[in-house]
A protein has these predicted regions:
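Acidic, glycine/proline-rich low-complexity segments that act as flexible tails and inter-domain linkers
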Residues: 1-91
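Conserved small/polar residues in nucleotide/adenosyl-binding loops
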Residues: 225-234
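Short glycine/serine/threonine-rich phosphate/pyrophosphate-binding segments
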Residues: 88-100, 120-122, 163, 189, ...
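Gly/Ser/Thr-rich active-site loops/lids in small-molecule metabolic enzymes
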Residues: 196-213
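Phosphate/diphosphate-binding glycine-rich loops and adjacent basic-rich segments that engage nucleotide
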Residues: 141-198
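A glycine-rich phosphate/pyrophosphate-binding beta-strand-loop-alpha-helix module
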Residues: 44, 93-149
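Hydrophobic alpha-helical segments, chiefly the membrane-spanning helices
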Residues: 236-242
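General beta-strand structural signal in soluble alpha/beta enzymes
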Residues: 110-114, 135-138, 153-155, 177-181, ...
């Protein structure tokens, strides 16, 4: 298999994007731990230096979902995920978690996917843990929480066990890779709706384009500007087919 991946590395080093199928295959191989660490690191660095395309991000997201612990919710629940990419470096308030809890209190079914803090004062998991929330570890617990309260939080490490093979490589590289932006797109519950916040206009565009080819009913990608100008503070991108 590594011979095929070496060809993908050459493709990336030549500045050529991978197809969605190639990206999904690469993701599954990385998650299986079947790629030599040096080659895995080289592939991730080459992809980052080239710049991820929407097809590549979508392929990685689809592959990551396939190896995740499946959380199949009843269609009648029509859950929404309210999530942000993080990465703005502003050390700001965790907006997505507050919005998710408020939405659940207003009657929506929220299946929120997230992790601990990377760039903000507190990640979704940090905040919920401080409030005394207990993370579900199985799909049935997620279903029960949503039916009882309208809210459940899928703590990423509990539902993406295969990522243990990727974690050491990411830690060794110490640079941003495609995995830094996959979190919002890899909810194992496969929500019908998304409200996604991005840290830059480029990221908002990439996320919108990536979501437009995924199985969901509707998504809204938003970007908040903190300029003092009263005009154009908030911009949004709507995926054309989502």
């Amino acid at each position: 298999m590594n011979h095929g991946l070496e060809r993908l590395l050459g493709q990336l080093m030549n500045g050529e994007s991978l197809s969605e199928e190639q990206s999904e295959t690469l993701m599954i191989a990385l998650a299986a731990g079947s790629v030599e660490p040096a080659l895995a690191g080289a592939l991730l660095v080459a992809l980052s230096m080239k710049g991820e395309s929407a097809e590549e991000v979508r392929g990685f997201a689809n592959g990551m979902r396939k190896v995740a612990t499946e959380v199949k919710l009843d269609d009648s629940l029509e859950p929404i995920d309210i999530v942000g990419t993080g990465g703005d470096g502003s050390q700001s308030f965790n907006i997505s978690t507050g919005s998710a809890l408020l939405s659940a209190a207003c009657g929506l079914n929220v299946a929120k996917h997230g992790n601990r803090s990377v760039s903000s004062k507190s990640g979704s998991a940090d905040l919920l843990e401080f409030l005394g929330y207990r993370f579900p570890t199985e799909a049935d617990a997620v279903k029960t929480q949503i039916r009882k309260t309208g809210f459940s939080f899928l703590f990423a490490p509990n539902f993406h066990p295969a990522m243990k093979h990727v974690a050491p490589i990411r830690q060794a590289l110490k640079i941003r890779t495609v995995f830094n932006i996959l979190g919002p797109l890899t909810n194992p519950a496969k929500p019908s709706f998304y409200l996604l916040g991005a840290f830059s206009s480029e990221m908002a565009s990439l996320m919108a384009s990536s979501l437009s080819g995924m199985e969901l009913k509707r998504a809204f990608v938003c970007l908040l500007y903190t300029s003092p100008s009263p005009r154009d503070r908030t911009r949004s991108r709507m995926p054309s087919s989502a």
